[in-house]
Curated annotation (Swiss-Prot):
Annotated propeptide span(s): 478-669
Enzymatic reactions: Endohydrolysis of (1->4)-alpha-D-glucosidic linkages in polysaccharides containing three or more (1->4)-alpha-linked D-glucose units
Signal peptide residue numbers: 1-24
Organism name: Pseudoalteromonas haloplanktis
Binding site for Ca(2+): N112, Q159, D168, H202
Protein name stated in the entry: Alpha-amylase
Keywords: Calcium, Carbohydrate metabolism, Chloride, Disulfide bond, Glycosidase, Hydrolase, Metal-binding, Secreted, Signal
Domain of life the protein comes from: Bacteria
Entry-linked PANTHER family: ALPHA-AMYLASE
Disulfide bonds: C44-C98, C144-C161, C352-C359, C426-C440
Amino acid sequence: MKLNKIITTAGLSLGLLLPSIATATPTTFVHLFEWNWQDVAQECEQYLGPKGYAAVQVSPPNEHITGSQWWTRYQPVSYELQSRGGNRAQFIDMVNRCSAAGVDIYVDTLINHMAAGSGTGTAGNSFGNKSFPIYSPQDFHESCTINNSDYGNDRYRVQNCELVGLADLDTASNYVQNTIAAYINDLQAIGVKGFRFDASKHVAASDIQSLMAKVNGSPVVFQEVIDQGGEAVGASEYLSTGLVTEFKYSTELGNTFRNGSLAWLSNFGEGWGFMPSSSAVVFVDNHDNQRGHGGAGNVITFEDGRLYDLANVFMLAYPYGYPKVMSSYDFHGDTDAGGPNVPVHNNGNLECFASNWKCEHRWSYIAGGVDFRNNTADNWAVTNWWDNTNNQISFGRGSSGHMAINKEDSTLTATVQTDMASGQYCNVLKGELSADAKSCSGEVITVNSDGTINLNIGAWDAMAIHKNAKLNTSSASSTESDWQRTVIFINAQTQSGQDMFIRGGIDHAYANANLGRNCQTSNFECAMPIRHNNLKNVTTSPWKANDNYLDWYGIENGQSSEAEGSATDWTTNVWPAGWGAEKTVNTDGFGVTPLNIWGEHYWMLDVDMDCSKAVNGWFELKAFIKNGQGWETAIAQDNAPYTSTNHMAQCGKINKFEFNNSGVVIRSF
């Protein structure tokens, strides 16, 4: 074996092999599951690079069987770069653009098997009866089935029989090894920096060692070895050939966050019998176990909302392993379903967070957790651990950072010791430090002169601060807030069970070209800070909790998953006697309001808004009717201050619109 091919997470956490345009050493990679190459490239440029992600794991790029299911990508037909993700030219373009953004590409690589059955692949190649463009029947093991009982006691069958009927390559064969190595070397020549070896447990570790001897350079390699204990093939066998997926991490973290006590986690990692940190790739969930297979257990997924946030915050804050963030799509209970038919970057619209792509890597608690890990990599130890013996914990990373999680229904109030310098810090889970370090877009945490923090963390919430998120309080911020009451009315005929939400702010392209705001990197730059005035409607009030911005991205962290943006309330100017007892906004949160002088079916957003974020007093918005018409179409409003396909409203005014109509009435209070 070639020792120079061993890459460890210790090296990764020190920044080896990982270029970055971010301000700190990248320490975390993300799996953009089933994203096409154009979307990956755009995400590298607009978000992953600026946010400090180290790399992207992409779906297998080689030719595969046809079909819409996600697992068709895991049935190879050839090693031609023609897949559902795109063609060779598009793949090369993605690698180059991501590299320029400081983000490496890791390829999911299928070394154990080829496709089952017969047919035609995505590049037009035919296959069948173990005959493929690059392999013949003699390149495969004899057909036999892996039984469930084999995993505990029959190494031979696990590594020589067929995984779910897939043609099992003879990976001890020199020809097979040379063919796979040629594919890997081709990808490296393009610029790929790492490889996930799928189903590595089904390939003898000695075969992988021989394969790696034929691979050029020193790519990052991490091997999928599902080992929950009691296996005929153990994960420890693969430590000499690269990094290894630590599935016990995902299972035990899920068990603890769901049913246990976070206080147990003070020695999480090797102290729990896991492999050495320097060898482990860790994750809260992955594309297999979030669907209930592939090492599944009591796994936490995006469907768990805030619990998922908190589990990822812990993973990213705790110094163990090389973490992988999962970026999923909503499969609506169909575990075979492929990705959404709409691209992530859809003609200027980001199809994230709702019922299509979930984009967990953009959730502020997860992106903030990555920022925390990047900026605490120089202190690879836990300091000042504190817990309440149950589900409130806090710990530090020396003088580099400190964090706390409250997974209880009551507020966490405690004074904890840190090793950090005194001052005010931005809670990077909830906001971002301004470029001049004079303000934070979210919560500010104070470290006292003695290094303590007086924690006051709400139920099911968290905080994380680091040395590079410290506010410069020597002078006041140059931009003063200008909070003014602002009301939006949008008329739309709706039915029972339908509700209207509004998204808005400043158009990203306009802000970048004319205002110098990079809103692709930071949505806060184009969002309008708001405070809801009407919290009396029992239906919409829960949707307004933790809705602090009128923005383009919908659900904010801590906001109800039922929300589709900023919730509005149904209003009218009169209440006929035939409707029963009169309902009013003042008493009930919906119904009659003196602000509505037009008629029924006017949905109202009543907020205080920071007008200092508007463009000469103007901002944009668009409505969405849940369980109804969906989004409005393009708007062409007369006398708009600049060209836009959205409604244009004035901050500090009453603005009246019609759904899917370009007209507007604006009046003062």
